[in-house]
Amino acid sequence: MSKTLLHLAVCALCSVSAVAQTTKDAAIYAPTATGEQLTNLYLNSAILNGGSAVLPGGVAGDARGMAVVNGKMYVCNRDAEGSKLIELDARTGSLLRKIELPADMWKEGEKALGFICNDVQVDNAGHIFVSNMATDMRGTVVTNAFRVNYVDVTKTPVAYKTVLNATLPATLPKTMRIDTYDLYGDILNGDGIIMLPVSGNEAGAGNTVIKYTVTSGVADAANPQTIVLTKFNPEKAVASGAAPRINIIDNDLFYHDGFNTMPMLYDMNGAVVDGFQNNKPLTPASTGQNGVTEFELNGSYYLIVASTNTDDKEAPQAFDIFKFKDEGRSFAAMTLLYRFPQAGLGGVGNAVRTALPRVEIIDGEGGHKKALINIYAYRNGYGGYEFVNNVSTGITKVEGEQLDYTVSGNVITVNGAAKAISLYNVIGQKVAETVNGQTVKAPARGVYVLNVQCKNGNTKTVKVVID
């Protein structure tokens, strides 16, 4: 954990805004010791809305899936009148358009599919796809069908093409409910895969992922591959539970995250490759919120997971961002950088379980790239953050013996008056500060990062344990 804590070292001059804002995350996320920094662009959350539910763009309707492409966020929406995509500016959260979707894309003849416009995804070529929810794919009638439609939102009315329309054999013993999906490749014009995680609390359903191969823009709906997941975290879990999410990394690997389970990396045979079982101290606070994504930025590799549930006491419905040590992307060697939003999105309870991080890599300063991170949690809000990894921190890392201090109870005393003494918890939140003093008091027992700005301007950082 010491390596993790050193990565959380922060500059003593950074501060946290004392005034709550209605459109911004009030927290300031200090640079890490390795040059990352997270900056909020906007935040529309239940916490900033007095605890009340938040609707994307203020548009009524049921909105579950979210995707981002070309600087725009798209959120699924359905109501009694039909379905639409809510288009938002990914940097400001402003409502741009309410894009009505053709009713015919959810029908077979005069018969309609169930639970239309439930999830939205973007393929590697930037095409947008929307699906329904199938409460049971077993059978041959229209209500059993799971359908994925490409939609061209640049046209009015929206043009669409069905790329997958599939059912499963009625002889399967368990209910095969599909809430979500993911895709990889050029699904519209080229080759790729579409994968459906099955919801459920029983083995035979909730430990299953259905995979379809796409060739030249045509999905082989008649020949799906059934992937049985061999293990879960926690080990006692036998199935994912409600509304699992997957994130396809490439043709060989994917993440799976369920209501009953932690995010886990699998191969296409269902064998476990890696996961938080190999780094238990960094395990998310709880299961129950489903969302995970991995990305590369300027040669470094990162992971974002939905880390807290709506009942968390400190930061309900928040996300964790981790840094892998290298391109091997080992969980055992990764470090926690930030938990965000620092106060969470909100505690509005729901059965949907959607808590999605989406990342778009865009041009930054000086030839570097930066990441535009958008988050969305059903009824609890959404926000945008900018993430860079080329910040000059000016932090001097030292070993513990180079910074003399004593601990008496919860009070830490350093050797000589300092310009500023700051104390941070393990997720980078400032918990105490002293200016022009020699002592600082920890709020409780635990592990902290002590940051001291000396009178000569040097900054020293060390891990401190209060027991």
Language-model segments: what does each one mean?
Residues I47-S83:
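Beta-strand-rich domains and repeat architectures in extracellular enzymes and scaffolds
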Residues A60-G65, W106-Q121, N165-I187, T230-I249, ...:
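Repeated scaffold domains used in trafficking and secretory/extracellular systems
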Residues M66, V447-D467:
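C-terminal tail/sorting-segment detector
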Residues D79-S83, A134-V141, S199-A205, N260-M262, ...:
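Short glycine/acidic-enriched loop and turn motifs that connect beta-strands
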Residues Q277-F340:
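Loop/turn-rich, solvent-exposed surfaces of beta-rich toroidal or solenoidal domains
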Residues G347-S392:
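Blade-level signature of beta-propeller repeat domains, shared across WD40, Kelch, NHL, RCC1
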Residues F387-V411, N415, K419:
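Residue-level detector of functionally pivotal "anchor" positions at catalytic/ligand-binding pockets or at interdomain
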Residues V391-V398, L423, G428, Y448-L450, ...:
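Terminal processing/anchoring signals of secreted or surface-associated proteins
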